[in-house]
Amino acid sequence: MPMAKKLNISRINELKTNAYDNIESYDDPDTPKALEQFTSQIKKVLQADPKMLESVPEYLPVALYGRVKFPSDAKLKWAHWINTATQPDWDEFKVTIGFNNADLPLVLAVRAYSEDLLIESCAVLYLLENQGKATPAPKRSADDDFEDEDSDYADYSDDDDDEGEEEDGYYDHYDDEDR
C-alpha cells in the first residue's frame, strides 16, 4: 500500500487565515451582496484559469465558502485527517464532501489542475465551518465551550434518515465523470 500523503497543516492554517480575512473584508452589513458578488467573479476567473491559484490559493476556499456540505458521518473522517495531517486519496475524499451543482465546473477545472489543492481547500472549508474562524473567540470556561458546541451542531443531528438520498443541488457522483 502506498504511503499516505501528508496534509501540510501549517499551509492549511495559513490558507484558512487568508481566506477568512478575504471573507471578512467583503462581509459588510452595509453591502450585503459584496461577498456574493466577489465570489461569483472569483469563480468565473478561476474556472477559466485555475493556474491563478498558484499566486492566490486562498481564493478557492473563498469561492466555495458556505457552498460545500460535509455529511455528519464524514466530519469524523475530516477531523481524523486533520489531526493526523493525513491527506485523503481521491476515492476517500470524494465520498466525504458535497459540492453545490452550480460549482461543479469550477471544482472539475481545479481538480484537473491540482487535485491536492482542491483537497487542501476543502480542508480549509472544513476548519472554517467546524473550528470557527481565524479570530479568537471571547474567553469562556471549558464547560461553556462544551455546551455551546452541542448547540452549534443541532442542524447536523445523527438521526438524519436521508442516508443514501441525494440532497437537492449537491453533487456527489464523481465516478460518473470518469465514464
Swiss-Prot record:
Induction: Part of the atcJABC operon. The operon is constitutively expressed, and expression shows only a very slight increase at low temperature.
Biased composition (Acidic residues): 144-179
Region Disordered, residue ranges: 133-179
Phenotype upon gene inactivation: Deletion of the gene does not affect growth at low temperature.
Cysteines engaged in disulfide bonds, as pairs: none
Coiled-coil portions: none
Primary role: Part of an operon involved in cold adaptation.
Designated name of the protein: Adaptation to cold protein A
Lineage of producing organism: Bacteria, Pseudomonadati, Pseudomonadota, Gammaproteobacteria, Alteromonadales
Gene designation per UniProt: atcA
